């Protein structure tokens, strides 16, 4: 979605109220009108970090890039918004030094209908159009267009990834079929990445410990308790950019099975009823998620979200390369830390906890919990990479699952470990033993028969382990 045009220095904007503000002929001479208050507010939401409350900041171009916006003169501003009958729909001019550069024009083809450009509300066609045309005025090209730097790859050519494409869903043939409030509520990940490539990334916005929250009944997006996005219907369809700090997605109000993925470029679903209906595509016609994560800017991990507070149903939560804190709360949850030194807390229910790489802390909570380990590298003998289970309770049917690890790679197939209790390694490949101290237990596995541990798991309690406590 990159073009060959961008602004330099402060980007000024204006909402002219008189045709005489324009030095060129054409649009101004064909039913000129000033934009509505709703259009003005939508434009300010998308541009200005200082518009409204601080909750909006991260969703504005000024908030996620280093571009600086300021109110300018109606005759000379870089980006100007107005209405004309000349474009039947809407269009905008790229940045430049020519007279029309940066001007955004909205037509009247949909006047008096639900798609009227004068009535943008987060998630409707008019809102989407304003984001799209502002993108052009700042230097973004069409996502479906092979000009300039090429079109979006086919697997990303949908409004789930960019407001700049005409493709409503993967394979839509450059057409929109979404429901009335089924459009993106913000710039999406490809747009954010392109604008950051042009203007730099702002890591000061929401650089503290920010809490993002969504309401199951209305779809409102809250940032640190203040409403940032008030959609026209109970739909959530946005991308989050966060500048730094230790940040949290608080989804504790949800009673539906959450599907959360904190990895860059991935999407999370809070409630299927809050998914935007796109009219087709690989997810039964719906958007693949409610909230999408921004891509990393040049590999900088400060924009990652670190923590998740789950709901009361059966949640699936995947972390990222940061040190995540993931709390499942009630329900039979599946928690995965991905990379980083994570804290996974299942809460009430029969949970599965998979720390992944890093020295992870695993808390199953009440219920029959399963602690999964899938490779030797995920829990090392060295403390720097060793996982700790804090509440292994055999009487609650907690189990340690090693079944994915091949205990003997010299034999075809996935071999199971042989549990030898507290006995020393004998030199057999695939032996599993444990040591119990006064208040700790250490589990060791030898996969190559050299009588040395190849991985270790720490239990924060003295437990007399038995073969039945493992899934081998």
Question: What function would you assign to each model-found segment?
Answer:
Residues 252, 374, 403, 444-446:
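Predominantly extracellular/luminal cell-surface or secreted proteins
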Residues 1-309:
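Zinc-dependent metalloendopeptidases
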Residues 103, 259, 341-343, 386, ...:
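Well-ordered beta-strand positions in beta-sheet-rich domains
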Residues 309, 389-390, 470-471:
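Beta-propeller blade termini
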Residues 290, 294, 302, 306, ...:
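Low-complexity acidic/polar repeat-biased segments
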């Amino acid at each position: 979605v990159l073009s060959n045009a961008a602004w330099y220095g402060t980007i000024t904007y204006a909402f002219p109220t008189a045709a005489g503000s324009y030095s060129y002929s054409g649009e101004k001479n064909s039913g000129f009108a000033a934009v509505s208050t709703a259009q003005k507010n939508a434009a300010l939401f998308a541009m200005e970090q200082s518009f409204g409350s601080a909750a909006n900041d991260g969703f504005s171009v000024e908030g996620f890039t280093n571009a600086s916006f300021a109110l300018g003169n109606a005759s000379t501003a870089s980006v100007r918004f107005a209405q004309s009958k000349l474009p039947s729909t809407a269009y905008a001019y790229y940045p430049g030094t020519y007279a029309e550069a940066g001007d955004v024009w909205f037509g009247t083809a949909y006047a008096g209908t639900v798609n009227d450009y004068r009535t943008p509300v987060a998630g409707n066609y008019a809102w989407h159009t304003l984001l799209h045309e502002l993108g052009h005025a700042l230097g973004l090209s069409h996502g479906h267009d092979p000009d300039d730097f090429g079109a979006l790859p086919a697997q990303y050519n949908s409004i789930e990834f960019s407001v700049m494409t005409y493709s409503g869903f993967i394979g839509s043939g450059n057409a929109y079929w979404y429901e009335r409030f089924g459009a993106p509520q913000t710039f999406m990940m490809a747009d954010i990445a392109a604008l950051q490539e042009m203007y730099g990334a702002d890591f000061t916005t929401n650089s503290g410990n920010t809490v993002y929250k969504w309401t199951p009944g209305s779809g409102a997006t809250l940032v640190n308790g203040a409403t940032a996005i008030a959609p026209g219907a109970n739909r959530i369809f946005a991308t989050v950019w966060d500048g730094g700090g230790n940040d949290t997605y608080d989804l504790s109000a949800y009673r539906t099975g959450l599907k959360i993925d904190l990895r860059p470029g991935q999407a999370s679903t809070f409630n299927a009823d809050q998914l935007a209906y796109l009219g087709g595509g690989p997810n039964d016609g719906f958007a693949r998620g409610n909230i999408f994560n921004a891509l990393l800017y040049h590999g900088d991990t400060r924009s990652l979200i670190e923590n998740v507070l789950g709901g009361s149903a059966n949640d699936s939560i995947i972390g990222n390369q940061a040190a995540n804190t993931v709390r499942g709360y009630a329900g039979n949850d599946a928690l995965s830390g991905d990379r980083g030194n994570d804290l996974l807390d299942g809460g009430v229910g029969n949970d599965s906890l998979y720390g992944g790489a890093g020295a992870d802390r695993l808390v199953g909570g009440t219920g029959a919990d399963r602690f999964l380990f899938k490779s030797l590298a995920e829990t090392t003998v060295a403390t720097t990479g060793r996982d700790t289970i804090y509440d292994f309770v055999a009487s609650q049917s907690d189990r340690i699952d090693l079944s994915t690890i091949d205990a003997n790679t010299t034999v075809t197939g996935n071999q199971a470990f042989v549990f030898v209790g507290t006995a020393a390694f004998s030199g057999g490949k695939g032996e599993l033993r444990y040591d119990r101290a006064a208040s700790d237990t250490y589990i060791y596995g030898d996969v190559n028969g050299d009588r040395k541990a190849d991985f270790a798991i720490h239990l924060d309690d003295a437990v007399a382990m038995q073969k039945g406590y493992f899934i081998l």
